Structure formats: structure tokens, C-alpha cells
Amino acid sequence: MDVSGQETDWRSTAFRQKLVSQIEDAMRKAGVAHSKSSKDMESHVFLKAKTRDEYLSLVARLIIHFRDIHNKKSQASVSDPMNALQSLTGGPAAGAAGIGMPPRGPGQSLGGMGSLGAMGQPMSLSGQPPPGTSGMAPHSMAVVSTATPQTQLQLQQVALQQQQQQQQFQQQQQAALQQQQQQQQQQQFQAQQSAMQQQFQAVVQQQQQLQQQQQQQQHLIKLHHQNQQQIQQQQQQLQRIAQLQLQQQQQQQQQQQQQQQQALQAQPPIQQPPMQQPQPPPSQALPQQLQQMHHTQHHQPPPQPQQPPVAQNQPSQLPPQSQTQPLVSQAQALPGQMLYTQPPLKFVRAPMVVQQPPVQPQVQQQQTAVQTAQAAQMVAPGVQMITEALAQGGMHIRARFPPTTAVSAIPSSSIPLGRQPMAQVSQSSLPMLSSPSPGQQVQTPQSMPPPPQPSPQPGQPSSQPNSNVSSGPAPSPSSFLPSPSPQPSQSPVTARTPQNFSVPSPGPLNTPVNPSSVMSPAGSSQAEEQQYLDKLKQLSKYIEPLRRMINKIDKNEDRKKDLSKMKSLLDILTDPSKRCPLKTLQKCEIALEKLKNDMAVPTPPPPPVPPTKQQYLCQPLLDAVLANIRSPVFNHSLYRTFVPAMTAIHGPPITAPVVCTRKRRLEDDERQSIPSVLQGEVARLDPKFLVNLDPSHCSNNGTVHLICKLDDKDLPSVPPLELSVPADYPAQSPLWIDRQWQYDANPFLQSVHRCMTSRLLQLPDKHSVTALLNTWAQSVHQACLSAA
């Protein structure tokens, strides 16, 4: 079944409109006036729900809620026997009509309830729920079904009989409900059975497909084992041929070396630099001979592409590129363990090299090159067959030879399975079988991947492609090489160490950690390295502008693609571990030249502008003043900056001394002008009155102006009271200076002003400052009471 279709069809307009009509039907039958329409309720439920099941369950709750209201109304009407009879004889109940079920008589059979009663809720395999159920379980609906004539008689006795008869009536209602539910469950069960049959057929088809895939995989595994057996037989044949060739070669080399030793003992040792041995022509001709032999030998048809074994219970066949498990278990004989599993010919690394003059390798190399070519001609057909099978089959081979066996193994760098294009290993790129004389250069194919180890061990040569292989006892990582000199250990000439005779590889042995940084061709690697470093140094001027450009467009969503390109360019320029070919670096230079104008726009480098006559000398200072003139601390900053300089130039400012004797004398006169009667009265005032002299008035004629404030925690804050006390007080009463505009702020202050004015009219003609202040406090209190 299409599960995705079920997940999306509930959002369709037709499905939602269907549920809206059901909600509206339930509301109409319940007879409840609601502020929201059925469409508003459905929209609220649709926004709240996240899945189909949640949406259907919320709609079902809403419909059940309205049906419960309808059932309560119908039960309330049952209390009247006559209304109950009329409602029952009139037709089916609203709940039964909503579900769409016909009424059932008392004689209808209730058989099969036990078997179908277990089908509680409909399974999710069916498409949409029936419109009456709205996705809910059938037993969760409160449905009032039709009553039989037997229940009509029971309803007539409800008002007259006991509670036990009411329970019997409820049981009969439940029986009618079960009949309706049974029919619904039968319909749902039939739909579920058809859906389950379709699903079962799909599962059976999938199982048949899986069985076919497993049979194909088993057939491929059998073919793989047969290929392994053929390869092992070929290895045994090669082993026998190599043993015969090595025995003949040992005998001939023993005789030749004895003659050379006798002839060279009379000559003084010639000092030659061991690191600069020329390559003789016989060793150079070996790769061409082997390549010609590989082309002329018989070509085996490539075996069928091997697919990795897949477990039988695997549901789908994985592609070969994603399988990283080895094809052959360790219990089986790996093809990498070729040639010699028993080491009969080993060499003793005795320190007898001191007695041997440095001229021997060159002479020995010329004599052994022809013999090695003959051995390679006999061994090459078997090697051709093995390498073709390995290269085309994509097998995983790893060398397991000890470094002192007579013939070395496959490269120590394991060939990855399925991740490198193995079809690139052509017949002409097969590894050579040759004697690793000290000056010999071994050509390795370009298509071999670099080994995973970044730096070789001391006993191994460099693992770069096209690198010269030193004559150490360890096998070359990417070629078939016999061990140096297959003679027995009793001959002192053959015990050579790689320290005396070796050819330097073009690249250093301590290669970088990143395997992708291994430089390619050997002849021009040093020149390209120097050219690469010069180009990188030349492009270093773009690093800072590129960083500023990246920071500028980092938050710009429209230029995400340009941002990723700029970041990759910056990584190439700044990260030394990320090496790239010189051509790539030249392309980066072209891209940076195109971006040069964009990068120079936001932050151009300050050009050296010569001072012209039009530019004002203090223009930067004026610009800074204009930029900060609105700052609140600007005046302080100017004072702190320029006052020390101005003081140093002009000296301290000249100011006259301040004479304050006259002012002090005026204050004494004012204090003496305040009458002592007024001073005593103010001192005896209530603490809630705060009295001060008005500093804005001068008492030329002896009149004292006072400002009084009301500080009472029980009264609100009001404007201060201004009094004018005459000089002959208490003979004359103090005057209130009416500031009416202060009381026009709000209605409360206006009420205070009215109360104060009316109370002042009630005071006697002669009154004191204390009486005036008390009247003021009473006016505020009265205004508070009137406002409350």
C-alpha cells in the first residue's frame, strides 16, 4: 500500500470538506448554538495537528463532544414517559442516523459478536475511516440507537419502578449498539483483509527477488573460488620455474664473482661516489623487453566482473564500490603469497662489505642484467596471466613476503577494492621482474595509487611513482623485485647493504604526511617544486584581500557559491598540507586576477597621496571634531587633550582674585533683617512643614519671602506654598502668593486651590504663619476626601 499517499491525502481540500460536513451535521443534531462555525473548528484542528492520525482523533473528539450533548438532551427528555415513547416510536436516534446504520429489531441475531468483538479499532492499513466514525474506535462513540418495542415498555416503567429496571434498559441499549458496531467491524475487517492480501503479495514478490539475488551472489562466489584455485596453480608453476632459474643463476654468478674477486684483489680500491652510479644500457633495456613480451604473450579473456559476496539475509544488493570487506578470508591462501612460501634462499647481512671495493656493483650489474632478462622471459607469461586476472577482477592483494626471500612480493601498498579504477592497469604497465642492481631504475605504472603510508621505513625505498629504487633488502612498494643477489651467504661479495650502493630517489624520503602531496615525475620534480613555491609566494599578496572579501560576504546568502570558491582558494594559499598541481595553481592565479577589482573595492590599500596645496593641514582634526561634536564627553576630551599644550605655550590664565566680603556682609544683613518673632515661630512649626527663604527675592524693605513645603506621609505631594511676611509682622498678617498656573495641571490640584481660597476667606484679619500653613494642610486633606 502507498503509505505516502495516506500521509498526504488528509491535507487535501476534499477530505477536509468531508470532515467539515460531519462536524456541521453533529452540531445541527446537537442543537447547540456556538460562536464558531464548523469550518472554523476544522481549520483550528488542522493547524494544530501534525499527522493524519492526530488530525482524525481531534476531529472525532469534536464530533463525540456534540453527540454527548445530544445524548444528554435525549436522556433528559426520557424522564417524561410520553416524550420518551414519542421519541422512540418516531424513528432512529440521532446517533444512529449520524452513523448511517439502519434500526435493528429485537429479533435480529447477535451471533458472531464474540469473534468480531476483538476487532477493537480499525487497522491503519485501510484508506480513510468511515464517515460516521471519523477515525475513532467504534466503542468510543456514544451513540443512541433505536429502541425495540420491548424497550418501549421498559421506558414507560422508568418513572414508576426501581433503579434495577433502568439498568436492564441500559443493557438492551448496549446490545443494540453492539449490533451496529458488529456491522461496522465486518465492513472494516473485509477492507483490511483485502489490503493485507495485497501487502502479502508484495512481500512474497520481494522475497522471490531476494532469493534470486542470493542465488546470483552464490554463483559469483563459486566463480571467485575457482579463479583463486587457478591462480594458486599458476603460482606453483611460477615457483618451480623461478627456483630452476635461480639455481642456474647462482652457479654462474659464483664462478664470475670468484674470477672478479681474484682479478680485483690486485687493484687498489677506486673511490667513487656511491650516490651517482650511471645506469648501464642493459638495465635500461629491461622494461622495453618486458613490455614487448607482455604484448606478444597470449591474452587471457578477462573474467567476469566480480561482485563482493552479500549475506543472504541482506535486503538489497549493495554496489561493489561501497563494499570494503576483503573478498578472501585469511584462512584461504591469498594470491599475494606467491612465489616462495618456504624461504630456502636467504641472505645473511654480514658486515663484510668493507672488504669489497666499490667498483663491483657496476661490473656485476652488467653481467647479471642479461641473465635476469632471460629469467624474466620465462616468468613473464605466468606473471602476465596473474596480473591480468588481478587487475580486471579488482581483487584485494597485499604482499606478505619477508624482506629476505629470493623473489619479492606484490607492492606493499594495498590496492583498494572497487574504489580505484582497476581497468587502468594495462598489459604494458605490469611490474617487472629484474635484479635491483644499485644503478637500476625501476619504472612503475602511473595508474598505481600512492601507498597509504606517508614516510617509508628505513629499509624501504621511497614509495613515489617513477622513483629510483635503492638496492635495499626490502621489496619495492610497487614492483615485483627479487632480493638483491640470490647467492648463498658464504660469498662475501654478495652481502651488500643499502648504505654503500644506492641511487637517490628524486624526491626526499621524508615525504609529506598528506599522500596527495607526492610530487609526480621524477626528472623535473625539483624544478616544479621550486616553481610551485615561487608561484605560491607570488600569490601570497592575495591572502589578506581574500580574507577581507570572505568576511564581507560571509552573511550574504546570495553569494554562497562564490564564498565556497573563495574559501577553497584561501585554503590552497594558506594551508601547506593542501598541495595541488602547478596547473591548478595557475588557474587559481587567473581567478584571483578576476577578483582583484572586487577585493580592492571594500578596503583599498591607502595610496601614497602627495600633499597638495588644496588639502588643508588640519583637515583630519576638523573631521574628527565634526564626527564627535555631539558626544556628551567631547568638551571634557578637548579640555584634557589641548589644555596641557596651551598651558605650556601661553602659561597659566591670568584671573583676578575673588573678593567675597561684600556678599558675606549682605548675608549678615539679611539674617539680621528676619524678625526674631518669625524665627521662633518657624522653629516651633510642625515637622511636616519645611520652611526656607526664597533665594530669588531680596528684602530691601524688610519683607521676608518664604517657601513652604508639605512633607506628610499621609498626604500627596502638592506645589510649595509661597508666603510674603511683612516687616512689621505680627502687626500685619502674612500674604499667600497665589501661583494659580501651578494648580491647573489636574483636577485634584484645582480642588486644592478652591479649598485653600475658601478657607482663607474664613480666617480672621490678623492671623499667623502657623494658621496659614495649617489651613493649607487642611485644604489638601479636604481635596483628598472629596476625590475619594
From Swiss-Prot:
Expressed in all tissues examined, including heart, brain, lung, spleen, thymus, pancreas, blood leukocyte and placenta. However, the level of expression varied, with highest expression in the placenta and peripheral blood and lowest in the pancreas and kidney. The modification Asymmetric dimethylarginine is found at residue 349. Keywords: Activator, Cytoplasm, Methylation, Nucleus, Phosphoprotein, Transcription, Transcription regulation, Ubl conjugation. A motif (Nuclear localization signal) lies at residues 547-564. Residues 270-284, 447-459 have a biased composition (Pro residues). The modification Phosphothreonine is found at residue 603. GO terms for biological process: positive regulation of transcription elongation by RNA polymerase II; positive regulation of transcription initiation by RNA polymerase II; RNA polymerase II preinitiation complex assembly; somatic stem cell population maintenance. The keyword Ubl conjugation applies. Pfam families: Med15_C, Med15_M, Med15_N. Component of the Mediator complex, which is composed of MED1, MED4, MED6, MED7, MED8, MED9, MED10, MED11, MED12, MED13, MED13L, MED14, MED15, MED16, MED17, MED18, MED19, MED20, MED21, MED22, MED23, MED24, MED25, MED26, MED27, MED29, MED30, MED31, CCNC, CDK8 and CDC2L6/CDK11. The MED12, MED13, CCNC and CDK8 subunits form a distinct module termed the CDK8 module. Mediator containing the CDK8 module is less active than Mediator lacking this module in supporting transcriptional activation. Component of the Mediator complex, a coactivator involved in the regulated transcription of nearly all RNA polymerase II-dependent genes. Mediator functions as a bridge to convey information from gene-specific regulatory proteins to the basal RNA polymerase II transcription machinery. Mediator is recruited to promoters by direct interactions with regulatory proteins and serves as a scaffold for the assembly of a functional preinitiation complex with RNA polymerase II and the general transcription factors. Required for cholesterol-dependent gene regulation. This is Mediator of RNA polymerase II transcription subunit 15. It comes from Homo sapiens.
